[in-house]
């Protein structure tokens, strides 16, 4: 090993604040695994109540499908009339704010955490995600840390948002690029 090699054994996570104490974090782990994510639990009201009990701020009319993962509900804000599709993953080591009338499709990944690869111990490098009203995050997409998805923007199936997305923009690819404007009819 040379002086400039990666040394994961020196990673300690000290630059990361979970936003909740150890007991709350452990309790959420079990509640999430046994009740919230469980395929036997089709009851959205129970899931929403548990998210709120653990600190999530959720508006009215949330539709939440099975196997949705929320790592830290205390770092989650969701507006009114939103959809969280089956198997979407909200990896919110930092704050995730979702506006109203937002669709997060099945298998989408909202990723607020990463590592600083320029430092040998690879400490966390986290940043919040903001998804504004009317946006649609397509199936099997990834929204990277620090991204703002502006009002009514669309991230198409399988795409990766590595930069902010303009209002009414439709984005596609890896990295996602704007391919056209979204026009909404009444």
Regions found by a protein language model. Give the residues of each.
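Short, functionally important structural connectors and interaction interfaces within domains
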Residues: 50, 60-62, 70, 121, ...
């Amino acid at each position: 090993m040379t002086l400039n090699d990666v040394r994961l054994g020196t990673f300690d996570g000290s630059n990361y604040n979970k936003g909740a104490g150890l007991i709350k974090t452990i309790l959420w782990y079990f509640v999430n695994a046994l009740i919230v994510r469980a395929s036997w639990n089709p009851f959205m009201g129970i899931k929403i109540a548990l998210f709120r009990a653990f600190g999530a701020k959720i508006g009215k009319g949330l539709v939440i499908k099975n196997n949705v993962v929320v790592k830290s509900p205390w770092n989650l804000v969701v507006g009114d009339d939103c959809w969280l599709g089956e198997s979407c993953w909200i990896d919110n080591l930092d704050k995730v704010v979702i506006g109203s009338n937002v669709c997060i499709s099945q298998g989408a990944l909202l990723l607020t955490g990463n590592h600083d690869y320029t430092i040998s111990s690879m400490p966390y490098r986290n940043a919040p995600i903001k998804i504004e009203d009317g946006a649609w995050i397509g199936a099997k997409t990834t929204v990277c840390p620090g991204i703002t998805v502006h009002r009514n923007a669309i991230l198409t199936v399988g795409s990766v948002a590595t930069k902010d997305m303009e209002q009414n923009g439709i984005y596609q690819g890896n990295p996602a690029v704007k391919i056209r404007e979204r026009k909404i009819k009444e």
